[in-house]
Design a protein with these regions (language model features):
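Small/aliphatic-rich secondary-structure junction motif
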Residues: 2-60, 111
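A structural preference for short, hydrophobic beta-strand core positions in alpha/beta folds
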Residues: 40, 97-99, 150
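Acidic, proline/glycine-rich short linear motifs
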Residues: 42-75, 156-160
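Structural beta-alpha unit
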Residues: 1-6, 19, 33, 82-118, ...
Length: 160
């Protein structure tokens, strides 16, 4: 049985990428240390109706692609959370998973209104990417009303 003390939750942005997996593990560990819950958020800014309006996709009215995408994403996040919890071990953490449409940075900021900490990954690709944050993490850092942790991608060390 998961113990939950009622403290403000930690919010983590997750999108299935390796970097968001690192952010998820960091957030889970932090939730264990703080004896609080975790809210895993996957935000997306793409829907079948939006794609259809641009002519990219034709979906019959009877086929609810948006619901199927949301459900599949929810299941993928649930698996990632379970794997991360097993990998970390330690105290169980109550986890709420949300898959929400909208601009990722705004969805994360809205989801963190009652949180104590917001955790996001930094995609960092290539030499230039390692020096910059992704657009979502940059927006979140600049507009958040609470502490934000940006978890960097792991960069392999290669001998010179």
């Amino acid at each position: 049985m998961t113990q939950f003390t009622g403290h403000a939750p930690i919010v983590v942005g997750t999108d299935g990428s390796d970097v968001s997996g690192l952010a998820l593990r960091f957030a889970l560990h932090e939730a264990q240390l703080r004896n609080t819950s975790l809210r895993a958020i996957c935000a997306y800014d793409f829907t079948a109706s939006r794609a259809s309006s641009f002519g990219w996709l034709t979906v019959p009215d009877s086929y609810d692609l948006d619901t199927q995408i949301r459900d599949a994403t929810y299941e993928a996040i649930a698996r990632a959370v379970e794997e991360a919890m097993q990998e970390l071990g330690g105290a169980p953490v109550e986890v709420e998973i949300k898959v929400e449409p909208g601009r990722p940075s705004q969805v994360l900021l809205d989801a963190s209104a009652d949180a104590c900490l917001l955790v996001v990954g930094s995609r960092g690709s290539g030499a230039w990417g390692r020096l910059t944050l992704g657009s979502t993490s940059t927006e979140v850092v600049h507009h958040a009303h609470l502490p934000v942790v940006v978890v960097p991608s792991r960069t392999p060390v290669t001998p010179s």
